[in-house]
Amino acid sequence: MEDVKLEFPSLPQCKDDAEEWTYPMRREMQEVLPGLFLGPYSSAMKSKLPILQKHGITHIICIRQNIEANFIKPNFQQLFRYLVLDIADNPVENIIRFFPMTKEFIDGSLQNGGKVLVHGNAGISRSAAFVIAYIMETFGMKYRDAFAYVQERRFCINPNAGFVHQLQEYEAIYLAKLTIQMMSPLQIERSLAVHSGTTGSVKRTHEEDDDFGNMQVATAQNG
């Protein structure tokens, strides 16, 4: 594939007067990026409506599994726009398939001056993984750097091992996707031609090896 230079926006840096993390803060939401908040379900409960409105929240991503639907629910559908994802906090759960729709949801909100809260149950594993994925793709970051950035703002995050593995895999996926999006039709055509030529060369090499092997067998039999 031809070299394509990808450009990403600068990552906002931590405020000098950032509040020092304390254990009770895990029950609250934190602003990870301007307009993007991460927190537990307790930060989106009915009793927290005044706080959500104070921070200007307009969109909420609610991450839960079916068995949690009775107590983790969209409480303000008449006030906020929701994206509800059915995802278990299980290492074998495929979360990569949801990354594109969550990025589109967050981007759409921020570009229109809105603010987004991403929450699961505890705000530690599932929701943290999605915020990390968003930051990786938006700012062109590796998993470990995006994790560290989010952890500076919400210290208690701890995506499960399966989610970590998928986030590490996602780096190559989003870079390839963005590279293709940046390429012109001519560049894509050239890249496909180069790939096809390489495949053809390999195929011809295998065929030549087979022909040579058959010739050796025939020679031995005739000898």
UniProtKB/Swiss-Prot annotation:
Pfam families (UniProt xref): DSPc (PF00782)
UniProt xrefs under PROSITE patterns: TYR_PHOSPHATASE_2, TYR_PHOSPHATASE_DUAL
InterPro entries reported for this sequence: Dual-sp_phosphatase_cat-dom, Prot-tyrosine_phosphatase-like, STYX-Interacting_Phosphatase, Tyr_Pase_dom, TYR_PHOSPHATASE_DUAL_dom
Domain Tyrosine-protein phosphatase: 28-176
Expression tissues: Widely expressed with highest levels in muscle, testis and brain. In testis, expression starts 13-14 days after birth and is limited to the seminiferous tubule and to round and elongating spermatids. Expression is low in condensing spermatids and pachytene spermatocytes, and absent in spermatogonia, spermatozoa and somatic Sertoli cells.
GO biological process: regulation of ERK1 and ERK2 cascade; spermatogenesis
Name of this chain's protein: Serine/threonine/tyrosine-interacting protein
